[in-house]
Each structure stands twice: as C-alpha cells, then as structure tokens.
UniProtKB/Swiss-Prot annotation:
Localisation per UniProt entry: Membrane
Cofactors, names only: heme
GO cellular component assignments: membrane
Protein name according to UniProt: Cytochrome P450 93B2
Pfam families linked to this entry: p450
Gene Ontology biological process terms from the UniProt entry: flavone biosynthetic process
Catalytic activities: a flavanone + reduced [NADPH--hemoprotein reductase] + O2 = a flavone + oxidized [NADPH--hemoprotein reductase] + 2 H2O + H(+)
Length: 511
C-alpha cells in the first residue's frame, strides 16, 4: 500500500463510515429482512466468519435460525440451512436465483465468459446443451469408457507396486492424477506423465485456480478497497491467468495444425476441444464463440471435474476405514455379486446397492463443494421476507447434511440409511430432486457432469475396496478435519501403505 492510499484510509474513514451506514439504515427500515446477528459498520458480519465459511454459517444458523441475513462487507447475503428453504429459493424462485457470484479473480481468470458464471440466457443454454448432449451424452460417455478403465487400472497397478515394496503412497495425489487424466483426455486428449507434460502443467494450474477461487479477497467485499490490492491477490491471479492462457494457446494451435493436415477424423469420438473448434469455425453456428470462450470452457470443466471427484472418493475411503463394519459389508456385496475372479466394471455398479449407498452417505457428510452459491437478479419475497436484487444466496448443503431434523444420528456414517429398511428409501437420488441431498446442485444450475461423476465414483471406490486394505500407520481413526477453500477436502493428505488382498494380482491380470 502506498502513502496516498494509507492517507486516504486514515483521514477519510469517518466520512466513509457515515456515508456507508446512512443509506443502509434507511433501506433497512423499509424492508423485512431475515434475522441477522450483530454487525459492525464497513465489515458487516465478516467478523463472524472463520476459515471454513460453511462451518461458520452452520454455527450462526444454529443460533439465529435456518434463514439468516448477513452483510459481508458491502455485499448483502442470505444463508439457507434446511431442505424446505432450499426448495423455496432454488425451485420456487429458480429464475430469480439463476445467476452466480462473480469476483475480480473469477472474471479475470475465466476471460469473463465462463459457462459456470455466465448469466442464464442464450449463450448459457447453448453451452449447457453442448455439455449435456454432446460431451456428456450416453454415446460419448460410452466412447470414453476405455479411457476411464485404463486410468483406473493404472492406479491399481501403482498401488500394487507400492504394496509389494511396503512403501507409503499419497493417495490424495494419486486420486487427483486419476481424475485429472480422465478429464484431460476427454477435454484435450492429453494425460499426466509425471515429466512436466502439458497435462501435468494443466493439473497444477487447475489446483492453483481452485485455491484462488476459494480464498477471501477483501477487494470483492469492501467497496472502497476494490482498487486497492491489499493482499497481493491481483498479482497472483493475473500470473496464473497468463500461464493458463499460454498453455491453452499452445494446445489449441497444435490442434488447429493437426486439423489443417487432416490428422483429426470426422465423426464420433471427438474430444471437447474439437467440438469447440467445430463451433468456432462454423459460420452458421447458433452461437459465435472466440478462442477465449474455448479456453474458459475447458477451464470450467477441468476445475469442476478434477478436484471434486477425487475429494469425494477420498472421503468415502476415509469413512470406510473409520467404519470397518461398513467396509466389510461392501466387500461381501462385491464377493456375492461379482466374485473374486474379475474386477468390478462400470456396468456392474447398478447391481451394487450398498456401494451406491456408501457414495450417497459420503456425499451427505462430506459434499466436495459444501455450499451452493447463487445471486438474485430481482427483488423477491421468500417466506414473508424481502430478498433484494443483488443478494448472494448461500445454500449450506454441508449443514443440511448434518441437520438432525432431516437425518437420524446425522454425524454417524450409516450407508444403510439409504437402503430399503433404513431411514430413507434407496430411491432418494442425488441429482437435485431431493433437497436434503444436493451434492450436485439442482435445476438449471445443476452439475451437467453428474452422470460421469457417479460412474467414476462407483467403479473407483468398488475397485479400491475389492483389491486393497489400508495401513494408516498406527492411526486408530483417520482425521476428518477439512481444509478451507472453494472445495472441502481433508485437512491433511491421505498417506498410507496399500495392502494387497489375496486375489489382487489374479484379478488385475484377468482384466
């Protein structure tokens, strides 16, 4: 901060304080806002928040109610912590809350045209259709099945080598490598090699982008700090953007050269980059896109499909290790349905209801993205309260998953609650129709990759259960603390010694 900026803050602070509070108090007198904790001028309720914001919101909700109004600096917000309220906001008033929160970092890194943050409209609808029908349609998911199968086999072989050498493995990193390779090959036909390949560089950049998106930037919340880079945040996200742009430009130029030389075949099985280049080169396309759109859309998918899936797999394994009875039931189901002569395949997973229940229970307790964030585009009234346009909505799905009014013994890992005879029926899905379980969101803004994610989760978890035990080096229970950020991974990496089960070599050799 330079001297002039410091003088500005010191000598004009009282004036800013007065000007800031006056209109806010006047507006409040004419609105019926939800309950709110005590606040301070300028910072509002920011002092109530710790590093794990979803947990801070949960604590506030237990004290002030399931619908609360907050002012984060100069940004009005509401926090929702029950399924009924989530339904009121996300379904009954879906169009009013169809926009997403933006930030200085998000707008810069994503070229201002990211699908994930685009307003609901023609462009958003076109890209959503491209995602769901073309890239993630049943035909294309089947086309990419060999890629998913190969990457899972590579993971299992890596773990088998570590097992025989009795060496520790960082399973957190191995799962990230797996999910990144699957997504990178679907996007751009590249994979991590461990030798500074383009895919390795992309993986590292995606992790950096995810960290940036999840970090608090005072310039996004205190209006008079907007042009003051107090945290050095701007320099960081601009540098990340430059590196990502240079990487994608190299990849796109290489692909364009291959297309000119006729090395890319027409027809089925194109990756997403080819699909986007087809749109770019099509003069009659419904929507005109640029190279910046292509780069932003690829980043959308890389960030959405890499960390989240790996985090979900890791949490499921951690809970199974901490709950050995559930782990044993899962193995019994695999033995009965599949046997011990071959690996579980994607086509088997619908016949493994306990594995599906494990996934639902892990996503209930540990949603990889703990909150759904929307922004209102118009004034609305919800349950008698005024919600002004421009209000940020936080639906705390982490809190909903721990709500004792929704779940019996909510802090316990009990997969059987999702089976017939449990607390809930197995028909309770995770695709956004049941508002007590929303790990993939709901409605128009629901995750378009839910089918791919569930295929990966099911087969990877089943294969890891089938082939290995885990020596966590003397720990009785694995740590379940979370790390702060846009996502909610474990606070510490999952490092263990994989223990090969009796028939692992035979099973791997037969596949």
């Amino acid at each position: 901060m330079n001297t002039l900026q410091l003088i500005f803050l010191l000598f004009f602070f009282p004036t800013l304080l007065f000007l800031y509070c006056l209109p806010y108090k006047r507006n409040q007198n004419h609105r019926r806002l939800p309950p709110s904790p005590p606040s301070f001028p300028i910072i509002g309720h920011l002092h109530h928040l710790g590093p794990l914001i979803h947990q801070s919101f949960h604590a506030l909700s237990t004290r002030y109610g399931s619908l609360i109004h907050l002012r984060l600096g100069s940004v009005p917000c509401v926090v929702v912590s029950t399924p009924d309220l989530a339904k009121d906001f996300l379904k009954t008033n879906e169009l009013a809350f169809s926009s997403r929160k933006h930030s200085l970092a998000i707008d810069h890194i994503t070229y201002g045209v990211a699908f994930a943050f685009a307003p609901y409209g023609t462009y958003w609808k076109f890209i959503k259709k491209l995602f769901t029908v073309e890239l993630l349609g049943t035909q294309n998911l089947s086309h990419f099945l060999p890629i998913r199968t190969h990457e899972i086999r590579e993971l299992l072989r890596t773990l088998m080598v570590k097992s025989r050498a009795k060496e520790r493995v960082n399973l957190t990193e191995e799962l990230l490598k797996l999910t990144n390779n699957v997504i990178s090959q679907m996007m751009m036909s590249i994979r991590c090699s461990g030798t500074n390949s383009e895919a390795d560089e992309a993986k590292n950049l995606v992790r950096e982008v995810t960290k940036i998106f999840g970090q608090f930037n005072v310039s996004d919340f205190i209006w008079f700090c907007k042009n003051i880079d107090l945290q050095g945040f701007k320099k960081r996200y601009e540098g990340t953007h430059r590196r990502y742009d240079a990487l994608l430009e190299r990849i796109i130029m290489g692909r364009e050269e291959n297309r000119r030389r006729g090395k890319i075949k027409d027809g089925e099985g194109k990756d997403f980059l080819d699909m986007l280049l087809d749109v770019l080169e099509d003069g009659k396309a419904e929507i005109k896109i640029t190279r910046d759109h292509i780069k932003a859309l690829i980043l959308d998918f890389l960030t959405a499909g890499t960390d989240t899936t790996a985090i979900a797999i890791e949490w499921a394994l951690v809970e199974l290790i901490n709950n050995p009875n559930a782990l044993e039931k899962a193995r019994q189901e695999i033995d009965q349905v599949i046997g011990d002569e071959r690996l579980v395949q994607e086509s088997d997973t619908p016949n493994l209801p306990y594995i599906q229940a494990i996934i639902k229970e892990a996503l209930r307790l540990h949603p990889p993205i703990p909150m759904l964030i929307r922004k209102s585009t118009e004034n609305v009234i919800v349950q008698g309260y005024d919600i002004p346009a421009g209000t940020l909505l936080f639906v705390n799905i982490w809190s909903i998953g721990r709500n004792p009014q929704c779940w019996e013994t909510p802090l316990e890992f009990k997969p059987h609650r999702f089976l017939d005879g449990g607390d809930l029926k197995s028909s309770l899905d995770i695709k956004g129709h049941n508002f007590q379980l929303l790990p993939f969101g709901t409605g128009r803004r629901g995750c378009p990759g839910v089918n791919l994610a569930m295929r990966e989760l099911s087969v990877v978890i089943a294969n890891l259960i089938q082939c290995f035990d885990w020596d966590v080096v003397g720990e009785r229970l694995l740590n379940t603390d979370e790390r702060a950020g846009l996502t909610a991974p474990r606070a510490v990496d999952f490092v263990c010694v994989p223990l090969e089960r009796g028939n692992t070599l035979k099973i791997l050799g037969s596949n």
